[in-house]
Amino acid sequence: MRLILLGAPGAGKGTQAKFICEKFGIPQISTGDMLRAAVKAGTPLGVEAKKVMDAGGLVSDDIIIGLVKDRLKDADCKNGYLFDGFPRTIPQAEAMKEAGVAIDYVLEIDVPFDAIIERMSGRRVHVASGRTYHVKYNPPKTEGVDDETGEALIQRDDDKEDTVRKRLDVYSQQTRPLVDYYSDWAAKGDATAKVSPPKYRKIAGVGDVDSITARVFEALK
């Protein structure tokens, strides 16, 4: 099982990725984790990436694809892999195809932006314990305070509505086009590609977690 999980920030990809990886016995591959590991290990690509990052630049797609290809040689990838947060852009998707990275499924978790904004902007956190609440779906017994300690809850900057909207804008411009890219490739094929087209699946990411997970596994049959 080799797949890419697509969906907006806050669509619940992280939760479903965990279930998919457990069910199929595959690793979740995050480019951030890969970069940190390569830099720490001092691999040739890691050294190159560190130079760019130390200068405040963005690591090039060539370096990222090189890291991906190295990572896929590891023994834990023999049953497959799940890409989390990658590819983010069309050039990255093209580079993956060109590099012959095989993908069986592209699964989109579709959640309306209004629902994501409500989901994320309603989160409240007790910093010391990490306990999380939601003003609508999982409210504390007393508004604004932690159930166990009575200490104040905060809204993280990442969860503030204007921040969420900005992240959704970036997703719309950069990552959303991947949905069309993969659905077109799945539908029409590409005779020049080194790998077979993936199957493209889209599920609704609204409702309780168990229902969404059931939809995910049904889509991956």
Swiss-Prot record:
CDD domains: ADK
Annotated stretches, region: NMP: 30-59
Gene3D superfamilies (alphabetical): P-loop containing nucleotide triphosphate hydrolases (3.40.50.300)
Residues the record lists as binding AMP: 31, 36, 57-59, 85-88, 92, 156, 167
TM segment ranges: none
Gene Ontology molecular function terms on file: adenylate kinase activity; ATP binding
UniProt entry keywords in alphabetical sequence: ATP-binding, Cytoplasm, Kinase, Nucleotide biosynthesis, Nucleotide-binding, Transferase
Family statement: Belongs to the adenylate kinase family.
Name of the protein: Adenylate kinase
Protein source organism: Cupriavidus pinatubonensis (strain JMP 134 / LMG 1197)
